[in-house]
Amino acid sequence: MHISNSQFWKRILKRCNGLKLVNLQTYLKPYRINLFIARNRAQITILQEDKLLEVEMLHPKMDNLCWLHKVAPGFPINGSKITIIHEPVHFYGTLLEMCKFAKRRITFASLYLGTGKLESELVQTIEHAILSSNGNIKARFLLDYMRGSRGVQNSRKMLEPLLKGKYAHCSEVFLYHTPKLRGLLKVIMPDRFNEVIGLQHMKLYMIDDTLIISGANLSNDYFTNRQDRYFIIEDAKELCDFYDDLVKRVGEFSFVLQSDGSTKLNSTLSSHPCEGPKQEFSEEAAHRIKTLFQNEIQKRIELNKQKEALDADTWIFPLVQMGQLNILHDSEVTLKLLQSASLGARLKLATGYFNLTSDYISAVLKHCQATCDLLTAHPTANGFFSAKGIASSIPAAYTKIEESFYKTCERLGQQERVTLWEFIKPGWTYHAKGLWYYLPGQQRPCLTLVGSPNFGYRSVNRDLETQIAIVTKNEKLQMALQEEQERLFMYAKLVTKRTFSQEDRIPPAWIRTTIVLFRYFF
């Protein structure tokens, strides 16, 4: 369903359950934001007061991006401080090297931490860094409770050494437990499948004032042959402070790992995620996130008046999605980006698991006017391809969803404007997700989304997610974004009608009959 600008602002306000985005008039009108200010004028609806404000823009073709300042905190940065790396091994090496020389903080948020040799070396490096700093480094981890507790040797066991010894007080491990997994459902659902109910999925890696944001988890595959995206943002203290605070806020309504391997619910929380009233927990947790977000927007308004902010050539906007807590922020912003892409623009969208929500499908096929290329994993590059049991059929289920989308494109006459591609690279799996936005007539993207969301039902409704929107006029950064996109699509194979008639691409009958249920959990 297409929504107008005024409907968009009201929808975000409603879905954020009372989150008020402050009036930007005192911020935008007297000051020229280099990224968005230009000779032309545009009328922009103010969310809080639902009235128009005149704002000058940087580039007439970027008018439809300035609204990001009104729905998320904006962090100015020089584009030269952003580095894109391409290989999992470089991601791991960067984490290791930066942890080795950390001075103040190491804050990691991930689905889980693996249990192999590489993961052990990472934990040992962090432990040694804390020791070398004489306890001046604060190490903080946020993982998913169920995924991090799976098996005898698990993430919790891996991190226990940090909670013992002379500097045990320097480390803390938070384990988020979804309020939706409780009672009989929690008892009967196998460990391998309980994560479909909902989990902590954010991927944030902060060392001092550097943020590495990615879709990659902390495990062997993601360090070796599982393709993802990795952005290193240096000298970004304020951005790191915000995300560090976000991790701490989620930690406030999570379990805390103890030195003996047990867990205790954070003492700052008055309600229990899986034993107390679900609504009470969800409302209390959501309030803490919304308060943080609102306060950050207010703070950015004042700080962004300074000359350093006005001279920035790049802006970063954090987007948060916590559907199980009724915080639908990232999905609304993403939907607006898709719907507002104009004729002549180009969008490149990637997801490790192709399962677009009905809103996203409608936006791409019915309202978006841009040329769209969608990249996802070929079945052999799907992370579940070599799985055992029922999980081995998951790639076939995604094939069925792809086929349904392809047929919808044909039925609506959009198969020329919207093209589907599959990543296939021998020996590799594919996990990259995000978006590259090209203005009409431009050869390089000026905006990208990078982070944890997959644009599917899980990301929107079940998991804790975050990604950042990077808007830039820095030519070198735009070139780096273009190179990143080309490297991923270099291994892409075009999807055609014949793709789905190949013998190895025809899903079993039981998949075809259960796909409606499947798509709401994966």
Task: Give the predicted meaning of each segment.
Residues 448-450, 468-470:
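C-terminal soluble interaction/assembly domains
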Residues 358-361, 373-375, 383-386, 432, ...:
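Extended hydrophobic-aromatic, low-complexity segments
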Residues 111, 350-353:
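Structural motif
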Residues 141, 213, 349, 374-376, ...:
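Structural beta-sheet core signal
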Residues 41-43, 47-50, 56, 60-101, ...:
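HKD-type phospholipase D/PLD-like phosphodiesterase module
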Residues 243-277, 478-522:
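Cysteine/selenocysteine-centered motifs that mediate thiol-based redox chemistry or coordinate metal-sulfur cofactors
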Residues 1-57, 62:
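N-terminal mitochondrial targeting presequence
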Residues 362-367, 465:
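Short, solvent-exposed amphipathic alpha-helical segments in soluble enzyme
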